């Protein structure tokens, strides 16, 4: 029986890369984006327009997947996200609420809709967090709060649904070369400066993050749940020798 995987935020760099990898592994992909036109070249069996920042939009994504592919998705990859780089005293309330809505609300509502659709069946989910939820990075207060909420959600839900056979994990990427970071990384000085922050050097690719997400969804991670895997070139855990 073919595995069905629902990928939200599938029009972004990491979502696209994950769709390619899971498609190559013979999964049937339901790709979700607010703008379905951006999914035209994404590897998917069905492309769904839905705003997962609302309960109704999240439920729509799961229902449309089930109706198109004949069953609820047993795999969920939530790649929706945004960022905000600003000190807290210069962060407007509207901007803060938008960051929480896009990053945390969408994760809560998507997980809620997916669990309900499975009706007690087992499955695996992976969410996108960030290194800024794990280590203090200046001027990232809003996104750190939102992604910290995602990590707490993952741990609590993993405990709640373990008995059902659901595995729920997350990845916490560092700076990744995607369309969302293209504006910063197109400047050589910014790219070189970012690369120097990581013990392994360089700026990681969307494909590298997607590989970690695909592994967490697969049988190789069958004994992992409630975990947040840092995909960050050692940024949050390693301090190399000073040369």
Predicted regions, residues:
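Conserved glycine-rich cofactor-binding loop
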Residues: 11-12
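Substrate-binding pocket helix/loop in short-chain dehydrogenase/reductase
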Residues: 87-88, 95-100, 194
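Active-site helix of classical SDR
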Residues: 111, 146, 154
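Alpha-helical segment proximal to the catalytic Tyr-Lys
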Residues: 116, 159-163, 222
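Residue(s) in the substrate-gating loop at a strand-loop-helix junction
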Residues: 130
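C-terminal helical subdomain
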Residues: 170, 189-224, 231-233
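Short C-terminal tail/terminal secondary-structure segment
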Residues: 225-243
């Amino acid at each position: 029986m073919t595995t069905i995987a629902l990928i939200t935020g599938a029009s972004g760099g990491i979502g696209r890369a994950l769709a390619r990898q899971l498609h190559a592994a013979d999964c049937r992909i339901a790709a979700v984006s607010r703008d379905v036109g951006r999914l035209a070249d994404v590897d998917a069996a069905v492309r769904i327009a839905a705003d997962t920042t609302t309960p109704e939009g999240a439920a729509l994504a799961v229902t449309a997947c089930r109706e198109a592919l004949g069953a609820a998705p047993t795999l969920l990859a939530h790649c929706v996200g945004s960022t905000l780089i600003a000190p807290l005293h210069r962060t407007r309330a509207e901007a803060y609420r938008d960051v929480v809505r896009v990053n945390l609300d969408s994760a809560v509502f998507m997980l809620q809709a997916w669990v309900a659709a499975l009706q007690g069946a087992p499955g695996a989910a992976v969410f996108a967090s960030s290194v800024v939820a794990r280590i203090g990075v200046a001027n990232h207060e809003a996104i750190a709060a939102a992604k910290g909420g995602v990590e707490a959600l993952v741990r609590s839900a993993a405990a709640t649904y373990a008995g059902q056979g659901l595995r729920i994990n997350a990845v916490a990427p560092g700076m990744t070369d995607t369309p969302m970071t293209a504006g910063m990384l197109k400047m050589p000085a910014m790219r070189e400066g970012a690369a120097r922050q990581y013990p392994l050097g360089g700026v990681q690719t969307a494909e590298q993050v997607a590989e970690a997400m695909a592994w967490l969804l697969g049988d190789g991670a069958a004994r992992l749940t409630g975990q947040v895997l840092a995909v960050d070139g050692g940024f949050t855990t390693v301090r190399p020798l000073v040369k």
